[in-house]
Regions:
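Conserved HGGG/HGGXW glycine-rich cap/lid loop of the alpha/beta-hydrolase fold
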Residues: 40-94
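Active-site loop/oxyanion-hole signature of alpha/beta-hydrolase fold enzymes
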Residues: 83-123, 292
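Gly/Ala-rich beta-loop-alpha elbow adjacent to hydrolase catalytic centers
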Residues: 124-128, 132
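Flexible "cap/lid" loop of the alpha/beta hydrolase fold
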Residues: 137, 144-176
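Conserved alpha/beta-hydrolase catalytic His-Asp/Glu region
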Residues: 179-231, 235-236
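Short beta-strand/loop motif that positions the catalytic acidic residue
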Residues: 240, 246-248
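Acidic catalytic loop of the alpha/beta-hydrolase fold
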Residues: 251-255
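Catalytic histidine-centered segment of alpha/beta-hydrolase-like enzymes
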Residues: 272, 278-291
Length: 300
């Protein structure tokens, strides 16, 4: 007796239903969504588990949705609900980019509230780490755990020099036909250069529905916010009682690694991870190790 012909449409529907239960599996294919925050549309991508405390990725200077390493996003999404987003005025999100970290933190909280989350974990990289610290200080009940990568405290060593360093490396990248992140995020050793090229290649894996690049005006306003953060008086980090994982490379040229040691010393419940022969983007260079450590931290 002949079997029934293969139902391709039915199989596709079943696969879509299964994907809905487990969540989108790959950042490469995660759809870009939008949510109204007051009168501004914020764009975001969501993947991983459909339930549980979400991990909100808070981005770096010039960073949009496409600037997160897919190995890090997919690795954490294997066990958690992950959400990346463009803050106000960045990428495809509307509005004007704030020129202060405090305003960026308020916008991030408003975005989280718009998605109706009562509690989240934060992964803040670089500028996103500044923002994450303020959120934990100002709305402590919203935050369960925090990962601070390639970042530093208010008034931290060398943060006021980020603007100069960024422009110099962008100019060098233009002359040498490189992505600026190859210079800003990685060491100039043979290994660092190799890892930088691999990272930039991974950022190009997504070919459809890519985000908009940051505008020059938004870039300048972000730099203004970073410079002001570097000029601030040190804040009392003892009030951040949540568990914190601090991670960085041992040779961060943007936010000097000394700031990571300072954070780990001043935060009451901090764990420090420093990666060898790595720079500002140490969590991307050592993505396999970082994902293991992040999953252990978030799951403990």
């Amino acid at each position: 007796m002949a079997g029934k012909p293969f139902d391709r449409r039915g199989a596709a529907r079943n696969l879509q239903t299964a994907d809905a239960r487990v969540g989108v599996r790959s950042y490469r294919n995660a759809p870009t969504k939008g949510v109204a925050v007051a009168e501004t549309r914020f764009v975001y991508r969501e993947l991983g588990l459909p339930t549980g405390v979400p991990v909100i990725f808070v981005n770096h200077l010039t960073g949009n949705l496409d600037n997160w390493d897919p190995r890090v996003v997919d690795g954490i999404a294997a066990r958690h609900r992950v959400i990346t987003f463009d803050n106000r005025g960045v990428g495809a999100t509307g509005g004007t980019t704030p020129d202060s970290v405090e305003a960026m933190a308020r916008d991030t909280v408003a975005f989280i509230r718009a998605l109706r989350f009562d509690q989240v974990d934060l992964l803040g990289f670089s500028l996103g780490g500044f923002v994450s610290q303020l959120i934990a200080q100002q709305v402590p009940t919203l935050v369960r755990k925090i990962i601070l990568a390639g970042t530093g405290p208010a008034g931290g060593e060398g943060i006021v020099n980020v603007t100069k360093r960024t422009y110099l490396d962008m100019l060098q990248a233009l002359v040498t036909l490189k992505d600026p992140k190859e210079l800003l995020f990685f060491t100039r050793t043979a290994n660092g250069k190799s890892e930088a090229r691999a990272f930039v290649k991974r950022l190009k894996e997504r070919t459809a529905d890519r985000d908009r690049a940051i505008t020059p005006r938004a870039f300048r306003r972000q730099l203004k916010a970073i410079h002001a953060w570097g000029l601030e008086a040190p804040s009392d980090l003892a009030g951040i009682q949540q568990p914190v994982l601090v991670a960085n490379g041992d040779d961060d040229r943007m936010v000097p690694t000394s700031n990571s040691y300072d954070l780990a010393r001043r935060l009451p419940n901090a764990t420090l991870r420093i990666y060898p022969d790595a720079g500002h983007g140490g969590i991307f260079q050592f993505h396999e190790r970082f994902v293991r450590e992040a999953l252990e931290f978030l799951g403990s």
